[in-house]
């Protein structure tokens, strides 16, 4: 018998398939391809099948049957289900073994994980790069006074210094938090991954994380008997952070007033830590050459920080009418301007070491500022290669903060 059939069917339709009417004939089907329900399966088989004792050219009658879903399941799904069930059974056994081998998670471990996640989100909320800069700044200013007066060291003094640094961090956390609360619409465009706009913390939690550090810092200032000057400087830092972000002031909307706010915050931080350090050691306030240098350097460096902070925020600032140096001049021009100002600052530091070799340790001044200047140059060139993408601009601004911290480390040894 000669059987020639062309079958086209899928698991999602009712196919026509040609089969012989005589069930006594031995049929050999060459191949068929069974894939997913969304694909049409075509199989073309052409074979010559003859009985052993019959060599005539007569062919059997061919009957076309309509096979429905039940017929399909018998023809196609049953062979597949054998292998599928076998695989599923093997997978189930392996999965069960893995579950049995896995140690049960204790309640203490789960609670510890939740606490770690919460602390991580809070740390991200307060802008880690600014917090690190404040910690290094405070530590180095106080450490320099201890290096010059090692005989005045005492552990109670270190404890008071740590409490004072916590108070300063309170104002820092407030400034970072209040800015995020009132910039939510802008940050949805500029920084959608921030904890507040991404929904990882609620607005209520954000207010708690913003106001609590400011209040705790103020209480610490009072408990340390810091005096009216340091208390006023702390309040000035809180006021500067408020008028920078909160309507109707929003000094951040103007590049000049924004720079003034940032200058007040950094100058106040620099002066207050130095003044408090000498007062705690029982020393009178003096404008030493090293402190005069770091004050002048950080003041000019604030220009670079103020101009570079909005490089990654151009799109959102333009949409909401916030005028910055970056929106006015563009990311490339601001980068060139800020880099140029900071490079001039480094040149001035090197020149200072050459002109007044007795007032400073010239070798350290020359080498350290040369290294920092070259690192700034290469970082600016790398930013230019990326065509000033928001991510690259953000990294560049954070690198400026690294240079900010590095300058205080240099201050320890000059």
Curated annotation (Swiss-Prot):
Expression across tissues is: Expressed in trichomes.
Q: What is its EC number?
A: 2.5.1.136
The UniProt entry lists the main location of this chain as plastid
Quote the transit peptide annotation as a residue range. 1-86
Q: Organism's domain of life?
A: Eukaryota
First-tier enzyme category under EC: transferase
Activity regulation note: Stimulated by CHIL2 but inhibited by CHIL1.
How this chain sits in the membrane, per its record, is: Multi-pass membrane protein
Per its UniProt record, the required cofactor names are:
Mg(2+)
The UniProt transmembrane annotation reads 153-173, 201-221, 229-249, 256-276, 281-301, 336-356, 359-379, 394-414
Q: Does the entry annotate any disulfide bonds, and if so which pairs?
A: none
PANTHER family, from UniProt? Answer: HOMOGENTISATE SOLANESYLTRANSFERASE, CHLOROPLASTIC
Q: How does it assemble?
A: Component an active demethylxanthohumol (DMX) biosynthetic metabolon in glandular trichomes (lupulin glands) that encompasses a chalcone synthase (CHS) and a membrane-bound prenyltransferase. Interacts with PT2, forming a functional metabolon. Interacts with CHIL2; this interaction promotes catalytic activity.
Q: Please explain the role this protein plays, according to its UniProt record.
A: Involved in the biosynthesis of prenylated phenolics natural products which contribute to the bitter taste of beer and display broad biological activities. Catalyzes the first prenylation step in the beta-bitter acid pathway. Uses dimethylallyl diphosphate (DMAPP) as the prenyl donor.
Q: What is this protein called?
A: 2-acylphloroglucinol 4-prenyltransferase
Phylogenetic lineage: Eukaryota, Viridiplantae, Streptophyta, Embryophyta, Tracheophyta
